[in-house]
C-alpha cells in the first residue's frame, strides 16, 4: 500500500498538470506544505534526542553505577553472530569492546559462526581469540549447524544457537540468570565506551528490569568516510530517522543491536 500511494501521488501530479493545471498547482502547494510541517515536526524530536545523547555521552556512568549496591554482580553476555565477516571488521568490533569504560571481567563474549562458512570462520576466530580472547571474563566460540529442520537460516537462528551454548557455560559458572544481560549485537557493532556502564545503570534502576528491553542509539558512522557518497547519505538519513523515533514512545522498538535480561 505505501508503494502504491507514493507512485499514485507522482502520477496524479503529472496527469493533473496536463488535464487540470490549476488543480496541479494547488496539489503541489498542499503537498509541499505537508512535508514542510512534517519536517519541522520531526526536527523537534531529532534535536531533543540529539541533545539528550550529547549529555549522556559526557557522563562517567561507571562512577554512577558503582554507587548502586550489587552492581558488581551483573554480567554481560555479548553475542556476535557472524557470516563471512572479514577479520578486520571483527578486529574493529573487539577493539571497541576492549576500550569500554567497564570492567572487562564482567563480559562473556560469544563469537557465533555458521557451519556454511566454517573454514573462513575458524581461521578468523584463531586470530581474534589470540588477540582478544584473554582480556574478557570468558570468550566462547560457537558454530551454528546448517540445515536444521524447521529453521530459517539467518542472524536470529545463529544467535539463538549461541545463546543455548552460552547457557551451559552460565550454568557451570552458577551465575543467576537475573544477573545476566544479553546483548545481541551485529558483527560490526562498536559500542560507545560508556555504553555498558550506562546499560548496567539503567538496568539496575528499572522497576521491572527483567521484563524490559534496552535499545541503544544506533549511529551509522563506523567507516562513513570510507563509504561511497550515496551510502553516506543513506547512513546519515537512517541515523536521523532513528533519533526522531527514540523521542517518540509510541514508536519504540528493538532492532539491530539491543539488550534484554537473560
Predicted regions and their residues:
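N-terminal membrane-anchoring/stem segments of glycan-assembly enzymes
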Residues: 1-67
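A short, charged/proline- and glycine-enriched loop
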Residues: 69-76, 178
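Hydrophobic targeting segments
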Residues: 73-82, 94-97, 106-113
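Short, acidic, metal-binding catalytic loop of nucleotide-sugar glycosyltransferases
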Residues: 93-106, 116, 131, 205-206
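A conserved acidic beta->alpha catalytic loop
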Residues: 113-128, 144-149
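Long helical/loop segments within the catalytic core of UDP-sugar-dependent glycosyltransferases
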Residues: 132-136, 140, 145, 151-171, ...
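Short aromatic/hydrophobic "clamp" motif used to bind/position activated sugar donors
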Residues: 182
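The conserved acidic donor/metal-binding loop of glycosyltransferases
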Residues: 186-190
